[in-house]
């Protein structure tokens, strides 16, 4: 089942909306990801968002090994999270992610963390830039236009 969710930014929401496939990454809250109260330590959500972003790209054929070999990058330039309900050690969750906007050289991802019983735990977003390292990973990176072929891989059918 492919869900179609759309989102947008700014005044031209209808123009900028992108109907994306929704990707799901299963995660489990482990002891080392909790604070002393036994609930999720807030940076864990950001780690899960990052893992979900890389998982999405791997699922459409842009896995980390390929991106590194082709000198491609998608650095994070902005991230936010709304904490709705605390996860507890051992909770099984899913990070549901989609792309809500493609700009010329940047894109926005929306993430939602759901506990296995469907309880929403957190919602967040990331803005990333599409780029290429000039001389390989670790060298200077420049933003690049996002290929239409890549956008098509994320588009909901």
Segments (PLM) and residue ranges:
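N-terminal amphipathic/basic-hydrophobic helices that include classical n-h-c signal peptides
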Residues: 1-9
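Catalytic strand-loop segment that frames the active site of acyl-thioester-processing enzymes
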Residues: 10-59
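Residue-level signal for pocket-adjacent positions within structured domains
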Residues: 29, 35, 62, 69, ...
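Hydrophobic beta-strand-centered segment that forms part of the acyl-chain substrate-binding groove
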Residues: 56-102, 106-107, 121-123
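Residues that recognize and position ribonucleotide moieties
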Residues: 38-39, 47, 72-74, 119, ...
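HotDog/MaoC-like acyl-thioester-processing domains
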Residues: 10-19, 25, 88-92, 100-157
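Hydrophobic residues in beta-strands and at strand termini
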Residues: 27-31, 83, 130
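Short loop/turn motifs enriched for small/polar and acidic residues
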Residues: 32, 77, 114
